[in-house]
From Swiss-Prot:
UniProt-listed InterPro entries: CEP162-like (IPR038774)
Biased composition (Basic and acidic residues): 91-118, 179-196, 213-227, 410-419, 1072-1105
Upper taxonomic lineage: Eukaryota, Metazoa, Chordata, Craniata, Vertebrata
Keyword NAD recorded: no
Species in which this protein is naturally found: Danio rerio (Zebrafish)
Gene that encodes it: cep162
UniProt family annotation: Belongs to the CEP162 family.
Localisation per UniProt entry: Cytoplasm, Cytoskeleton, Microtubule organizing center, Centrosome, Centriole
Coiled-coil ranges (or none): 573-688, 724-1081, 1126-1345
Tissues with expression: Ubiquitously expressed during early embryonic development.
Single Gene Ontology BP annotation: heart looping
Keywords: Cilium biogenesis/degradation, Coiled coil, Cytoplasm, Cytoskeleton, Microtubule
Protein name as annotated: Centrosomal protein of 162 kDa
Role noted for this protein: Required to promote assembly of the transition zone in primary cilia. Acts by specifically recognizing and binding the axonemal microtubule.
């Protein structure tokens, strides 16, 4: 049992180390061996001979000893071999060239070379810490960095100094910096990849160069305390041929050679060739064919049973080793076919029925067999790191040039294999090459590998064109944890090509020997029977499986029947089967032992050469560092020149520190300026964006206006001839305007919804702001900076929201303008359409009248002439016969009646024309009324939008005022009443302005109403004056009555409109009152149902009371005196004169309307002024009246009350005033109390910070000298090392326990699997015996019948491919 340091010994050594001075004067950079230091013996045990690790005992039998050894190695010899916690430590190779490398070789005589052997489960590149013998590496790094820094400063002193870069370099070059560690880790990985001289053994450490040069030739053979990789040891005890500890003397050396010799260009297959050839040449009988069939049957059944048993299990992380193509399909890719077949992958195990995957965990069922075999080999992963030509070292001189394969030879080999595949015409090759392929079955392997040959032929080019790097061989656990890189896969493919070549050579020898032994009758019978069985198997399997599996089953059936036939021929010699198997296994073991010895010799020579090379390099580095040190040395410490130089250096360092501080402050200022400039640029960008948006909207509006102006101009320029085209264009414009109006209404609706959402967001943000204020008051004073940041952020968000609201208000204004323009355009369009209709009607009427008049004139002229002639004749007859009789008088009266009827017909036509004209006017007036209704609606909506906009502006002003008030309340505890009064006065002035605006709007509406009423009165007066002009006919009376009814209806509608306008004025006043209450009170809500109700009433009043025309329109009473002396031309003249009068009246009405509007506005302004003056006088009178009443009351109280009551009341008043004053003071004191609490909290936090800073200052003053800095850094490093050591111990214990548990589980699973496999083999043998008996019975029956079995024409191995039969 090794000696472990006790706690007392460690404490004693540590106290001695603390007593000893470790200053710069006492330590000579580790070069002097005269002064022994405590650091040399720190952590050392009492000097005892170092144990050698025994390689003959397995690791699980002496765990305790090994643990103790590892602990001894961890603590002995200056504590050099503590392993860092699973992180890559800097190797000796990448120490900077400027650092003195002689440190690592100075103290070689005083040190023991101790290595902590590690498990194979640890990462490969977790190296051993180099010793800190004379002085710590980190302190030496610091000294060298300081020296480098000063020299660089001297070099760069003339130019400008980049202090930020110097600080970064100092931080990166610090030995404890994590960035430097990561740099060193990355350089370790690169150097381990690139450096070809690095040792690959797991036990190789960084302490290698510390050994003396005279021991370099002897110690590689003496000191071999390497422990084998744990999984490598496990794999040695996998097979059934080995027992626990049976191969102890020879096998560990094999594992060591395989694991620790990456450069020895080893391969898996060539080591087997002597055994294979001796077996192929020493058979000489037909029993070999039977043994071959047994082997094939066992291999195929093992694969099938393993696939069935392990199909249900989920694959572990080892499945990531597959290429991407094999995860999804069952077909092997070229990379899988190129994987190396390890030496323990099935050839070295004899002929017993062993499983295919013997050293692989259960989770590898999803990998192809070749990949599994590549995972099994202890040094196959090491082979993957090197080039393709590394197979010829151990072949025994058979293929000395196989490692010099070029790209051309590989492609030729692939082409040859493909040609052989094409020539074999009996059955297709199997889908998956089996792992346990023996030399007689090499044809199947070549065909399987040649199937994917065109794919890797491209990839094989890469490894040979690049330099080959040597990588330390990882253990099997590390190999399972990470997938192989593409270079390693390509290099493994090269190895597989060479193995395929070796298999082909052995196959030729073996195939010729076995095939020449067959008799022709036997081969013919087996061929016929196998063809029959093949047809049966194909017919049954093609229904269940794919074509590839059917071919596979058929080929396996043929191979099995060949093996049966051979077994039948060699039946008498079944007893010697076991003897031959034992002899072959013995030969294989001898060959493997000889191979291991050769590998061990080669490894020892290589390690000796490497040690010599490394020692020479270290001597060279030591010489270089000595010369560098002579350059840097300033002489002894007592030299006055050196002291002056040191003072100058300290002075320069102080100056540089002040410069650095100045630059740091300047950098902070520049950073703040840059932030301010960024904020200003962002604001400028936002302003420019808003300006661009505004200009774009103005541009679009200007374009629309130009388009409308162009349309109007073109409409004006066109003549009446293009009326149809004008009507179509106008209708299209009307439709476009309607679409635009709908789109604008949709935008208005959407903007309203967004505005409501923004209102909700604003309320939420206000609540959040209040909560933040409350939290800020609740929190302590040291949160002031965070509160200020939050206030700034909140202010920025509020400004952004205000900008958005302003943008929405502007957008609303633009929409209102657009709606006004739209309204004007629709009015113009309506006017133009009315004009077009008028022109159409007039044109058609004139044409019809002309035609009708022409016809009537022609007909009437003829009739008149006939009637006049007849009348004259009759009158003449009557006059002649009875001049004074009654019939003559009746005839005279009838003639006059006919003339009156003719005149009545003319008057009826004229009255129908006037009725049509009046109806058109009525329709036009109704359209105007509807337009007015729509205008009233739009104006109401515009007023609502203006109200909302003004409300938004007021809310924004209120929020601004609240914010200012809160800021001033924070800055000043109390605000004077004068400021409040000024604020209220400004608010009142703004309210008065809003009142004036709304009253002006109301006055404008009232003026419009009055003008309309005046127009109606004038129209009524004109109609009344026109009535008594002449005695109208009956139809004219009816038309006038209908017109009067319509005028009355229109007046009623006008009255209803005026009532609705009055209601609207009332709603406006009510809204003003609500706004006042809203501004005075906290509630911002407004009842929205009132305007809707009034709108509904207005809509109800808009419906006119429908009145029908009088029913006497169609009656035709006889009036003999009507139109007695008038003609149609007179009626037309009267109509024209009436029309001109009507136009003149309309012009007069417009003028009077304008003048009345001006007079109304003037009167309203005067009325407003008078009302304001009256209100001011009333308020002044009220105030004077109140003062007089108070004065009278006071005087009355003084006159009519006793002096005691007056005194008491005055005292009471004074007490109340004092109480109010004291309450104000109490409120002020409460505010000051809260401020005092906040300041107390701030003071406490500042005192705590001050105490911390004083402590840090004290520590900095204590540690201002380099000795104290060195001492404190060493203390911290010792503590960190102890902590890491304890962590490492715990991790090691955990890893050992986990590996024990895993190994036990694997052993149990292996035993169970072997048991199941043996049972399956026994069942297969029974079935095989039954099939053989049936075949023998068939052959006996054929012989008894006298059937002669013919000899085959060509017997070669290429024509028959025998595969095992799947039972």
């Amino acid at each position: 049992m090794a000696h472990r340091l006790t706690k007392e010994e460690l404490d004693q050594q540590f106290e001695q180390f603390l007593k000893e001075s470790v200053s710069d004067d006492s330590v000579d950079l580790g070069t002097s061996s005269k002064r022994p230091s405590v650091l040399d013996s720190l952590g050392k045990a009492p000097v005892r001979p170092v144990k050698k690790a025994s390689a003959s005992v397995p690791w699980w039998q002496d765990d305790d000893d090994n643990d103790d050894d590892s602990e001894e190695k961890g603590m002995s010899s200056t504590g050099r071999s503590f392993l860092k916690s699973l992180r890559k430590t800097p190797s000796i190779k990448e120490v900077d060239e400027e650092q003195p490398k002689e440190l690592f070789l100075e103290d070689e005589g005083n040190r023991d070379h101790v290595i902590l052997s590690r498990d194979s489960l640890e990462p490969e590149d977790s190296l051993v810490i180099p010793s800190a013998g004379a002085r710590g590496l980190d302190t030496l790094d610091e000294d060298d960095d300081d020296a480098r820094f000063l020299s660089n400063l001297k070099k760069v002193s003339s130019s400008s100094i980049d202090f930020s870069r110097i600080n970064r370099e100092q931080e990166l070059s610090a030995p404890t910096s994590p960035l430097r560690r990561e740099e060193m880790d990355s350089t370790i990985e690169e150097e381990q990849r690139m450096n070809k001289d690095t040792a690959a053994s797991p036990a190789y450490s960084e302490d290698f160069e510390e050994e003396a040069s005279d021991k370099s030739d002897v110690e590689p053979q003496e000191k071999k305390p390497e422990r084998l990789g744990m999984l490598a040891k496990v794999s040695l005890h996998d097979s059934l041929n080995s027992t626990d500890g049976a191969l102890a003397p020879a096998v560990p050396s094999l594992a060591v050679a395989r694991e620790n010799r990456p450069e020895s260009k080893q391969t898996d297959m060539p080591a087997l060739e002597p055994a294979v050839q001796s077996y192929g040449q020493s058979g000489g009988s037909e029993m070999e064919a039977l043994q071959e069939a047994y082997r094939q049957i066992s291999g195929s059944a093992g694969v099938c049973e393993d696939g069935q048993v392990e199909a249900g299990r989920t694959p572990l992380s080892l499945s990531t080793l597959q290429p991407a193509s094999t995860v999804e399909s069952d077909l092997p890719t070229a990379e899988e076919l190129m994987q190396p077949i390890g030496p323990d992958s099935g050839f070295t195990r004899g002929f017993s029925l062993q499983p295919i995957t013997e050293a692989v965990p259960r989770s590898r069922d999803n990998q192809s067999p070749l990949r599994i075999s590549s995972d099994e080999s202890p040094f196959s992963s090491a082979n993957e790191g090197y080039g393709g030509g590394n197979t010829a070292n151990l072949t025994g001189g058979e293929h000395p040039d196989s490692y010099k394969f070029t790209q051309k030879s590989i492609s030729e080999e692939i082409r040859r294999l493909m040609q052989e595949q094409d020539t074999s015409s009996q059955e297709p090759p199997p889908l998956k090459p089996k792992k346990r392929q023996v030399p007689a079955r090499s044809n199947a392997s070549t065909s399987a590998s040649s199937r994917k040959a065109p794919v890797p032929s491209v990839r094989v080019k890469k490894p040979e064109s690049k330099p080959l790097h040597r990588v330390p061989a990882p253990s099997r656990a590390a190999q399972a944890a990470k997938p192989p890189s593409p270079p390693t896969l390509r290099k493994a493919q090269n190895q597989t090509f060479k193995k395929t070549q070796n298999l082909n050579q052995t196959h030729t020898i073996k195939g010729l020997d076995t095939s020449l032994k067959l008799s022709s009758e036997l081969v013919e019978s087996v061929q016929s029977f196998a063809a029959f069985l093949q047809h049966q198997v194909e017919a049954s399997s093609l229904q269940d499986k794919g074509p590839f599996q059917a071919n596979k089953i058929a080929s396996e059936a043929m191979t099995a029947h060949k093996g049966m036939q051979e077994k039948m021929d060699g039946g008498p010699e079944l007893a010697s089967l076991e003897r031959l198997r034992l002899q072959l296994a013995k030969k294989e073991r001898e060959l493997s032992l000889r191979e291991d010895q050769l590998q061990e010799q080669h490894k020892q020579e290589l390690t000796a050469l490497r040690q010599e090379n490394y020692i020479l390099q270290s001597k060279l580095h030591r010489a270089e560092e000595a010369s560098n040190k002579r350059k840097w040395s300033f002489g002894e410490a007592s030299d006055p020149v050196t002291e002056e130089k040191l003072k100058l250096i300290e002075k320069e360092m102080k100056e540089q520190e002040t410069l650095i501080q100045g630059y740091h402050q300047e950098n902070e200022k520049l950073y703040l300026q840059m932030k301010a400039l960024q904020a200003q640029s962002k604001q400028n960008e936002e302003a420019l964006f808003m300006e661009n948006q505004r200009l774009l909207t103005e541009l679009s509006f200007a374009r629309d206006r130009m388009n409308t102006n162009n349309i109007q101009r073109t409409i004006r320029e066109r003549s009446i001839v293009d009326q149809s085209f004008n009507i179509a264009e106008l209708t299209s414009q009307v439709q476009a305007a309607q679409k635009k109006e709908e789109r604008l209404q949709e935008e208005v609706r959407r903007l309203k919804q967004e505005k409501q959402a923004l209102h909700v967001d604003l309320e939420m943000m206000r609540k959040e702001r209040d909560l933040a204020k409350v939290q800020a008051v609740c929190k302590s004073g040291d949160k002031g900076f965070e509160l200020k940041l939050l206030h700034d952020k909140h202010r920025e968000e509020v400004t952004e929201l205000k900008k958005r609201l302003q943008w929405y208000a502007k957008n609303q204004e633009l929409l209102d303008k657009d709606a006004a323009r739209l309204h004007a355009a629709t009015a113009e369009i309506q006017k133009l359409t009315e004009q077009v209709e008028k022109l159409k009607a007039e044109v058609s009427r004139r044409a019809n009248e002309q035609q009708r008049k022409a016809k009537e004139k022609a007909g009437e002229a003829k009739r008149i002439q006939d009637l006049e002639r007849q009348l004259k004749q009759k009158e003449e007859l009557l006059k002649r016969r009875h001049p004074n009789s009654l019939p003559a008088l009746i005839l005279a009266a009838a003639s006059t009646g006919a003339e009156e009827d003719r005149l009545d017909v003319r008057s009826l036509a004229q009255s129908s024309q006037t009725a049509a004209l009046l109806e058109r006017r009525v329709h036009r007036l109704e359209a105007e009324l509807e337009g007015r209704d729509e205008a009233a609606k739009r104006s109401l909506r515009a007023m609502e939008q203006q109200y909302h906009r003004i409300k938004l502006q007021y809310e924004q002003q209120i929020s601004d005022l609240e914010q200012r008030l809160s800021e001033k309340s924070h800055s000043y505890p109390a605000i004077s009443s004068e400021l409040i009064k000024s604020h209220t006065q400004t608010l009142k002035a703004e309210l008065e302005e809003v009142k004036e605006v709304h009253q002006k709007q109301v006055s404008v509406l009232q003026a419009e109403v009055d003008s309309l009423q005046e127009q109606l009165r004038q129209a009524q007066a004109s109609t009344q004056t026109e009535k008594p002009a002449r005695s109208p006919s009956r139809h004219q009376l009816h038309a006038e009555a209908a017109q009067a009814a319509r005028i009355e209806r229109l007046t009623q509608e006008l009255n209803s409109k005026s009532r609705s306008i009055q209601e609207l004025t009332r709603t406006i006043e009510r809204l003003q009152r609500e706004r006042r209450t809203m501004l005075s009170g906290p509630s911002h809500e407004r009842p929205n149902n009132e305007p809707k109700r009034h709108l509904g009433t207005a809509k109800d009043t808009k419906k006119p009371s429908v009145e029908t025309f009088p029913p006497t329109q169609d009656e035709k009473d006889y009036h003999p005196g009507a139109f007695s002396g008038t003609h149609i031309s007179e009626v037309q003249l009267e109509n024209d004169s009436l029309r001109t009068k009507l136009e003149e009246l309309e012009v007069l009405r417009e003028k009077e309307k304008v003048s009345l509007q001006a007079a109304v506005t003037h009167a309203q302004n005067q009325l407003l002024r008078i009302e304001e003056q009256n209100a001011e006088q009333l308020t002044s009178v009220k105030a004077e009246h109140r003062k007089e009443i108070e004065h009278l009351l006071a005087r009355h109280a003084l006159e009519h009350s006793s002096s005691r009551v007056a005194e008491l009341t005055s005292q009471l008043n004074t007490q109340e005033i004092i109480v109010q004053h004291l309450q104000g003071q109490v409120k002020e004191l409460q505010g000051t109390k809260e401020a005092l609490a906040v300041t107390k909290l701030r003071e406490e936090t500042l005192q705590n910070q001050l105490s911390k800073l004083l402590e840090e200052l004290k520590e900095a003053k204590e540690a201002h000298s380099p000795e104290l800095k060195h001492f404190t850094s060493l203390e911290q490093k010792i503590q960190s090392m102890e902590f890491r050591y304890s962590q490492r111990e715990k991790q090691l214990q955990q890893v050992i326990a986990d590996t024990r548990r895993v190994v036990e589980q694997e052993q149990q699973s292996e035993v169970e699997r072997w048991r199941k496999l043996a049972q399956g083999r026994a069942k297969e043998l029974e079935a095989f015996r039954m099939e053989l008996d049936s075949i023998l019975d068939v052959l006996r029956e054929l012989q008894r019948q006298g059937v002669v079995i013919p000899m085959p024409e060509h017997t070669s191995t290429n024509t028959h491919t025998y595969l095992p039969l799947r039972s």
